[in-house]
Curated annotation (Swiss-Prot):
The keyword Nucleus applies. It is found in: Nucleus; Cytoplasm. GO terms for biological process: positive regulation of transcription elongation by RNA polymerase II. The PWWP domain mediates the binding to H3K36me3. It comes from Saccharomyces cerevisiae (strain ATCC 204508 / S288c) (Baker's yeast). Present with 2610 molecules/cell in log phase SD medium. GO terms for molecular function: chromatin binding; RNA polymerase II complex binding. InterPro entries: IOC4-like_PWWP (IPR035503), PWWP_dom (IPR000313). It comes from the Eukaryota. This is NuA3 HAT complex component PDP3. Residues 7-68 form the PWWP domain. Histone-binding component of the NuA3b histone acetyltransferase complex. Targets the NuA3b HAT complex via histone H3K36me3 to the coding regions of actively transcribed genes to coordinate transcription elongation. Stimulates elongation by RNA polymerase II in vitro.
Length: 304
Protein backbone atom coordinates (compact mmCIF):
# COMPACT_ATOMS: atom_id res chain seq x y z
CA UNK A 1 0.00 0.00 0.00
CA UNK A 2 1.30 3.44 -0.91
CA UNK A 3 -0.99 5.45 1.37
CA UNK A 4 -0.57 5.87 5.12
CA UNK A 5 -2.02 2.64 6.50
CA UNK A 6 -4.35 2.85 9.51
CA UNK A 7 -6.29 0.43 11.69
CA UNK A 8 -9.63 -0.52 10.21
CA UNK A 9 -8.35 -0.37 6.63
CA UNK A 10 -9.49 -3.16 4.32
CA UNK A 11 -6.59 -4.90 2.62
CA UNK A 12 -5.64 -7.99 0.66
CA UNK A 13 -2.96 -10.11 2.30
CA UNK A 14 -1.22 -13.05 0.64
CA UNK A 15 0.11 -15.89 2.80
CA UNK A 16 2.17 -18.66 1.23
CA UNK A 17 0.36 -20.49 -1.55
CA UNK A 18 -3.06 -19.13 -0.54
CA UNK A 19 -4.67 -16.53 -2.81
CA UNK A 20 -4.74 -12.92 -1.59
CA UNK A 21 -7.29 -12.86 1.23
CA UNK A 22 -9.51 -9.99 2.48
CA UNK A 23 -8.43 -8.72 5.88
CA UNK A 24 -8.64 -5.68 8.13
CA UNK A 25 -5.71 -3.90 9.80
CA UNK A 26 -5.95 -4.64 13.54
CA UNK A 27 -4.78 -2.58 16.56
CA UNK A 28 -1.79 -4.32 18.13
CA UNK A 29 -2.81 -3.56 21.71
CA UNK A 30 -6.07 -5.49 21.21
CA UNK A 31 -4.47 -8.68 19.93
CA UNK A 32 -4.61 -11.96 21.82
CA UNK A 33 -1.43 -12.72 23.75
CA UNK A 34 -0.49 -15.64 21.49
CA UNK A 35 -0.67 -13.35 18.44
CA UNK A 36 1.08 -10.39 20.06
CA UNK A 37 4.01 -12.59 21.11
CA UNK A 38 4.81 -13.10 17.41
CA UNK A 39 5.01 -9.36 16.77
CA UNK A 40 7.48 -8.40 14.03
CA UNK A 41 9.22 -5.08 13.55
CA UNK A 42 8.04 -2.97 10.61
CA UNK A 43 4.93 -5.17 10.34
CA UNK A 44 1.28 -4.55 11.07
CA UNK A 45 -1.27 -7.11 12.22
CA UNK A 46 -4.17 -8.05 9.98
CA UNK A 47 -7.25 -10.08 10.85
CA UNK A 48 -8.70 -12.19 8.04
CA UNK A 49 -12.37 -12.36 7.14
CA UNK A 50 -14.07 -15.77 7.29
CA UNK A 51 -11.02 -17.13 9.11
CA UNK A 52 -9.99 -17.09 12.79
CA UNK A 53 -6.31 -16.29 12.18
CA UNK A 54 -4.13 -13.17 12.22
CA UNK A 55 -0.96 -12.40 10.28
CA UNK A 56 1.98 -10.01 10.57
CA UNK A 57 2.91 -8.31 7.30
CA UNK A 58 4.82 -5.31 5.99
CA UNK A 59 2.48 -2.57 4.73
CA UNK A 60 4.24 -2.51 1.36
CA UNK A 61 3.11 -6.10 0.78
CA UNK A 62 -0.54 -5.34 1.49
CA UNK A 63 -2.93 -4.22 -1.22
CA UNK A 64 -5.71 -1.75 -0.59
CA UNK A 65 -9.15 -3.32 -0.96
CA UNK A 66 -12.05 -1.09 -2.03
CA UNK A 67 -15.73 -1.82 -2.49
CA UNK A 68 -15.50 -1.87 -6.28
CA UNK A 69 -12.86 -4.62 -6.16
CA UNK A 70 -14.95 -6.56 -3.66
CA UNK A 71 -18.09 -6.27 -5.80
CA UNK A 72 -16.26 -7.34 -8.96
CA UNK A 73 -14.65 -10.36 -7.30
CA UNK A 74 -17.96 -11.62 -5.90
CA UNK A 75 -19.65 -11.09 -9.25
CA UNK A 76 -16.93 -13.00 -11.09
CA UNK A 77 -16.35 -15.89 -8.67
CA UNK A 78 -19.62 -16.39 -6.78
CA UNK A 79 -20.43 -19.57 -8.72
CA UNK A 80 -16.95 -21.07 -8.36
CA UNK A 81 -17.31 -23.92 -5.86
CA UNK A 82 -13.53 -24.18 -5.47
CA UNK A 83 -13.35 -20.63 -4.09
CA UNK A 84 -16.38 -20.73 -1.81
CA UNK A 85 -14.43 -19.85 1.33
CA UNK A 86 -12.71 -16.94 -0.40
CA UNK A 87 -15.98 -15.64 -1.84
CA UNK A 88 -17.53 -15.79 1.63
CA UNK A 89 -14.58 -13.78 2.95
CA UNK A 90 -15.22 -11.13 0.30
CA UNK A 91 -18.90 -11.08 1.26
CA UNK A 92 -17.99 -10.42 4.88
CA UNK A 93 -15.64 -7.65 3.75
CA UNK A 94 -18.46 -6.17 1.68
CA UNK A 95 -20.64 -5.90 4.78
CA UNK A 96 -17.85 -4.34 6.85
CA UNK A 97 -18.85 -0.75 7.64
CA UNK A 98 -18.28 -0.23 11.37
CA UNK A 99 -14.90 -1.11 12.87
CA UNK A 100 -16.18 -1.10 16.45
CA UNK A 101 -18.97 -3.53 15.59
CA UNK A 102 -16.39 -5.73 13.88
CA UNK A 103 -14.23 -5.66 17.02
CA UNK A 104 -17.16 -6.59 19.24
CA UNK A 105 -18.00 -9.57 17.02
CA UNK A 106 -14.35 -10.66 16.91
CA UNK A 107 -13.88 -10.40 20.67
CA UNK A 108 -17.13 -12.25 21.27
CA UNK A 109 -15.99 -14.99 18.88
CA UNK A 110 -12.75 -15.30 20.87
CA UNK A 111 -14.61 -15.13 24.19
CA UNK A 112 -12.80 -11.89 25.11
CA UNK A 113 -15.68 -9.42 25.07
CA UNK A 114 -15.01 -8.45 28.68
CA UNK A 115 -11.44 -7.52 27.66
CA UNK A 116 -12.71 -5.16 24.95
CA UNK A 117 -15.05 -3.48 27.41
CA UNK A 118 -12.14 -3.09 29.83
CA UNK A 119 -10.02 -1.49 27.10
CA UNK A 120 -12.77 0.95 26.20
CA UNK A 121 -13.43 1.79 29.85
CA UNK A 122 -9.74 2.50 30.49
CA UNK A 123 -9.53 4.72 27.41
CA UNK A 124 -12.83 6.46 28.03
CA UNK A 125 -14.29 5.83 24.59
CA UNK A 126 -15.06 3.17 22.02
CA UNK A 127 -12.25 1.83 19.85
CA UNK A 128 -12.51 3.38 16.39
CA UNK A 129 -10.64 3.04 13.11
CA UNK A 130 -7.84 5.33 11.99
CA UNK A 131 -5.16 4.62 14.59
CA UNK A 132 -1.46 4.02 14.00
CA UNK A 133 -1.19 0.23 13.45
CA UNK A 134 2.43 0.14 14.64
CA UNK A 135 1.62 1.22 18.19
CA UNK A 136 2.01 -1.69 20.60
CA UNK A 137 0.93 -2.20 24.17
CA UNK A 138 1.93 0.02 27.05
CA UNK A 139 3.12 -1.59 30.25
CA UNK A 140 -0.11 -0.67 32.03
CA UNK A 141 -2.32 -2.23 29.36
CA UNK A 142 -0.13 -5.31 29.15
CA UNK A 143 -0.29 -5.86 32.91
CA UNK A 144 -4.06 -5.53 32.97
CA UNK A 145 -4.35 -7.78 29.94
CA UNK A 146 -2.21 -10.44 31.55
CA UNK A 147 -4.33 -10.38 34.67
CA UNK A 148 -7.56 -10.58 32.68
CA UNK A 149 -6.33 -13.69 30.92
CA UNK A 150 -4.99 -15.50 33.97
CA UNK A 151 -7.72 -14.52 36.39
CA UNK A 152 -10.85 -13.92 34.33
CA UNK A 153 -10.58 -15.63 30.99
CA UNK A 154 -14.35 -16.01 30.77
CA UNK A 155 -17.07 -14.27 32.80
CA UNK A 156 -18.52 -17.66 33.70
CA UNK A 157 -15.25 -19.34 34.67
CA UNK A 158 -15.13 -18.17 38.28
CA UNK A 159 -18.73 -19.20 38.85
CA UNK A 160 -18.20 -22.62 37.32
CA UNK A 161 -14.70 -23.51 38.54
CA UNK A 162 -15.92 -25.51 41.51
CA UNK A 163 -18.78 -26.95 39.50
CA UNK A 164 -16.39 -28.25 36.84
CA UNK A 165 -14.44 -30.27 39.36
CA UNK A 166 -17.62 -31.97 40.58
CA UNK A 167 -18.74 -33.28 37.18
CA UNK A 168 -17.34 -36.79 36.81
CA UNK A 169 -19.36 -37.40 33.65
CA UNK A 170 -17.70 -34.40 31.98
CA UNK A 171 -14.16 -35.22 33.06
CA UNK A 172 -12.07 -36.28 30.03
CA UNK A 173 -11.60 -39.97 29.42
CA UNK A 174 -8.34 -41.59 30.49
CA UNK A 175 -8.47 -43.84 27.44
CA UNK A 176 -6.37 -43.04 24.43
CA UNK A 177 -7.84 -42.40 21.04
CA UNK A 178 -9.53 -45.62 19.80
CA UNK A 179 -7.56 -47.87 17.49
CA UNK A 180 -8.87 -50.14 14.75
CA UNK A 181 -8.92 -53.13 17.13
CA UNK A 182 -10.53 -51.43 20.09
CA UNK A 183 -12.78 -48.92 18.34
CA UNK A 184 -15.99 -50.96 18.66
CA UNK A 185 -15.73 -51.43 22.38
CA UNK A 186 -14.75 -47.83 22.98
CA UNK A 187 -17.59 -46.46 20.88
CA UNK A 188 -20.11 -48.59 22.73
CA UNK A 189 -19.16 -47.01 26.03
CA UNK A 190 -19.23 -43.54 24.54
CA UNK A 191 -22.72 -44.02 23.12
CA UNK A 192 -23.98 -44.63 26.63
CA UNK A 193 -22.19 -41.54 27.88
CA UNK A 194 -23.65 -39.39 25.11
CA UNK A 195 -27.14 -40.67 25.84
CA UNK A 196 -26.81 -39.79 29.52
CA UNK A 197 -25.42 -36.29 28.96
CA UNK A 198 -27.02 -35.31 25.65
CA UNK A 199 -29.31 -32.71 27.20
CA UNK A 200 -26.21 -30.92 28.53
CA UNK A 201 -24.21 -31.09 25.30
CA UNK A 202 -24.06 -27.29 24.88
CA UNK A 203 -22.82 -26.74 28.43
CA UNK A 204 -20.25 -29.53 28.10
CA UNK A 205 -19.09 -28.28 24.69
CA UNK A 206 -18.50 -24.83 26.17
CA UNK A 207 -16.58 -26.39 29.05
CA UNK A 208 -14.35 -28.31 26.63
CA UNK A 209 -13.74 -25.14 24.65
CA UNK A 210 -12.81 -23.11 27.74
CA UNK A 211 -10.40 -25.74 29.02
CA UNK A 212 -8.62 -26.26 25.70
CA UNK A 213 -8.51 -22.52 25.04
CA UNK A 214 -7.07 -21.85 28.48
CA UNK A 215 -4.47 -24.60 28.07
CA UNK A 216 -3.22 -23.67 24.59
CA UNK A 217 -4.34 -20.23 23.43
CA UNK A 218 -5.01 -17.68 26.15
CA UNK A 219 -1.70 -17.78 27.98
CA UNK A 220 1.62 -15.96 28.28
CA UNK A 221 3.85 -19.00 28.84
CA UNK A 222 4.13 -22.40 27.12
CA UNK A 223 1.61 -24.99 28.37
CA UNK A 224 2.78 -27.29 31.14
CA UNK A 225 3.08 -31.04 30.76
CA UNK A 226 -0.18 -31.47 32.68
CA UNK A 227 -2.01 -29.00 30.41
CA UNK A 228 -0.71 -30.73 27.29
CA UNK A 229 -1.82 -34.10 28.64
CA UNK A 230 -5.24 -32.76 29.59
CA UNK A 231 -5.69 -31.22 26.14
CA UNK A 232 -4.87 -34.52 24.44
CA UNK A 233 -7.44 -36.23 26.67
CA UNK A 234 -10.08 -33.63 25.87
CA UNK A 235 -9.45 -33.87 22.14
CA UNK A 236 -9.63 -37.66 22.32
CA UNK A 237 -12.97 -37.42 24.11
CA UNK A 238 -14.25 -35.08 21.40
CA UNK A 239 -12.98 -37.42 18.69
CA UNK A 240 -14.64 -40.43 20.29
CA UNK A 241 -18.00 -38.64 20.40
CA UNK A 242 -17.88 -37.10 16.93
CA UNK A 243 -18.71 -40.20 14.91
CA UNK A 244 -21.90 -41.66 16.34
CA UNK A 245 -25.42 -42.11 15.03
CA UNK A 246 -26.47 -39.30 17.35
CA UNK A 247 -23.46 -36.92 17.43
CA UNK A 248 -22.86 -35.36 20.80
CA UNK A 249 -21.28 -32.29 19.18
CA UNK A 250 -24.23 -31.40 16.96
CA UNK A 251 -25.21 -28.17 15.21
CA UNK A 252 -26.54 -26.54 18.37
CA UNK A 253 -23.47 -27.48 20.42
CA UNK A 254 -21.05 -26.08 17.84
CA UNK A 255 -23.13 -22.96 17.25
CA UNK A 256 -23.11 -22.05 20.93
CA UNK A 257 -19.60 -23.17 21.88
CA UNK A 258 -17.73 -22.27 18.64
CA UNK A 259 -15.54 -25.26 19.42
CA UNK A 260 -14.83 -25.78 15.71
CA UNK A 261 -13.33 -22.29 15.45
CA UNK A 262 -10.99 -23.04 18.34
CA UNK A 263 -9.79 -26.23 16.62
CA UNK A 264 -9.20 -24.26 13.41
CA UNK A 265 -7.12 -21.76 15.35
CA UNK A 266 -5.04 -24.63 16.78
CA UNK A 267 -4.51 -26.11 13.31
CA UNK A 268 -3.35 -22.71 12.05
CA UNK A 269 -0.75 -22.36 14.82
CA UNK A 270 2.53 -24.06 13.83
CA UNK A 271 3.63 -24.13 17.47
CA UNK A 272 0.78 -26.54 18.28
CA UNK A 273 1.71 -29.12 15.66
CA UNK A 274 1.32 -32.12 17.96
CA UNK A 275 -2.43 -31.42 18.13
CA UNK A 276 -2.93 -30.87 14.39
CA UNK A 277 -3.67 -34.46 13.23
CA UNK A 278 -6.49 -35.06 15.72
CA UNK A 279 -7.95 -31.57 15.30
CA UNK A 280 -8.04 -32.06 11.53
CA UNK A 281 -9.82 -35.41 11.89
CA UNK A 282 -12.40 -33.88 14.19
CA UNK A 283 -12.97 -30.95 11.84
CA UNK A 284 -13.35 -33.36 8.95
CA UNK A 285 -16.05 -35.26 10.83
CA UNK A 286 -17.81 -31.92 11.45
CA UNK A 287 -17.51 -30.73 7.83
CA UNK A 288 -21.25 -30.83 7.12
CA UNK A 289 -22.08 -29.07 10.38
CA UNK A 290 -19.50 -26.34 9.74
CA UNK A 291 -20.91 -25.79 6.25
CA UNK A 292 -24.38 -25.42 7.72
CA UNK A 293 -23.15 -22.90 10.29
CA UNK A 294 -21.52 -20.84 7.54
CA UNK A 295 -24.80 -20.83 5.62
CA UNK A 296 -26.57 -19.56 8.72
CA UNK A 297 -24.01 -16.80 9.10
CA UNK A 298 -24.35 -15.70 5.48
CA UNK A 299 -28.13 -15.68 5.72
CA UNK A 300 -27.88 -13.46 8.79
CA UNK A 301 -25.78 -10.87 6.95
CA UNK A 302 -27.73 -7.80 5.79
CA UNK A 303 -28.52 -7.75 2.08
CA UNK A 304 -27.20 -4.81 0.06
Amino acid sequence: MTKDIRTGDLVLCKVGSFPPWPAVVFPQRLLRNDVYRKRKSNCVAVCFFNDPTYYWEQPSRLKELDQDSIHNFILEHSKNANQRELVNAYKEAKNFDDFNVFLQEKFEEENRLSDLKAFEKSEGSKIVAGEDPFVGRTKVVNKRKKNSISIKEDPEDNQKSNEEESKPNIKPSKKKRPTANSGGKSNSGNKKKVKLDYSRRVEISQLFRRRIQRNLIQRETPPTEHEIKETHELLNRIYENSDTKRPFFDLKALRESKLHKLLKAIVNDPDLGEFHPLCKEILLSWADLITELKKEKLQALPTP
